[in-house]
């Protein structure tokens, strides 16, 4: 009875760790990873590790598109990747395209929230790369609050009065060198490089 309960518990844990997306699985420490098999081969292409299963699934979709074309079965059939592929891509190029497409997921979610539409994203792999790179997104900052500051706000608004400090024009007197009657202040036996 106890063994059966333990087996059921393990089975539930394993199904919870499984993803509902193709090519995606969850690591024990919580990261979602994605990889894809090459057609007619046992070799796999590692597509990366992601924070969410959706990003990992989008990476799989991009690799699926690069390897099998637009008629492949995607995790997100309503939002297939739009990657321009003029020639067959190398595994590092597929990794790069998959990473770029996966990381555009946040932009799509933001676009859905703002407009209710899913914007199409076109990705063009440039030159061959030896490693997958992650696309960076630019953030627009709103600096309109600077208009509220007074015009003379800045370094020129600080006074030049440093009354708490000396002006630096009075230096401490240099102490005179005293004669110690032939005694040297430096012990010559301590010199490291005595050749």
From Swiss-Prot:
Q: Entry's InterPro entries?
A: AP2/ERF_dom, AP2/ERF_dom_sf, AP2/ERF_TF_ERF_subfamily, DNA-bd_dom_sf
Q: Which residues bind DNA?
A: 20-77
Residues forming coiled coils: none
Biased-composition ranges, Basic and acidic residues, are: 1-13
Keywords attached to this entry: Activator, DNA-binding, Ethylene signaling pathway, Nucleus, Transcription, Transcription regulation
Q: Which Pfam families match?
A: AP2 (PF00847)
Gene Ontology terms: biological process: cell division; defense response to insect; ethylene-activated signaling pathway; phloem or xylem histogenesis; response to wounding
Where does the record place the region Disordered?
1-22
In terms of Gene3D superfamilies, this protein maps to: AP2/ERF domain (3.30.730.10)
Q: Which family does it belong to?
A: Belongs to the AP2/ERF transcription factor family. ERF subfamily.
This one is known as: Ethylene-responsive transcription factor ERF018
Q: Give the source species.
A: Arabidopsis thaliana
Q: What is the lineage of its organism?
A: Eukaryota, Viridiplantae, Streptophyta, Embryophyta, Tracheophyta
UniProt lists the gene as ERF018
């Amino acid at each position: 009875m106890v063994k059966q309960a333990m087996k059921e518990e393990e089975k539930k844990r394993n199904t919870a760790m499984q993803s509902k997306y193709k090519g995606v699985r969850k690591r024990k420490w919580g990261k979602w990873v994605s990889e894809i098999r090459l057609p007619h081969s046992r070799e796999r292409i590692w597509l990366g590790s992601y924070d969410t299963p959706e990003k990992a699934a989008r990476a799989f979709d991009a690799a699926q598109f690069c390897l099998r074309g637009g008629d492949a079965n995607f995790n997100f059939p309503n939002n297939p990747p739009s990657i321009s592929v003029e020639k067959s891509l190398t595994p590092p190029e597929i990794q790069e395209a998959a990473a770029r497409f996966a990381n555009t997921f946040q932009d799509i979610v933001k676009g859905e929230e703002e407009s209710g539409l899913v914007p199409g994203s076109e990705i063009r792999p440039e030159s061959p790369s030896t490693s997958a790179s992650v696309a960076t997104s630019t953030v627009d900052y709103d600096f309109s609050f600077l208009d509220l500051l007074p015009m003379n706000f800045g370094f020129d608004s600080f006074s030049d009065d440093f009354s708490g400090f000396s002006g630096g024009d009075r230096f401490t007197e240099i102490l005179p060198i005293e004669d110690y009657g032939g005694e040297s202040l430096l012990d010559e036996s301590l010199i490291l490089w005595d050749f």
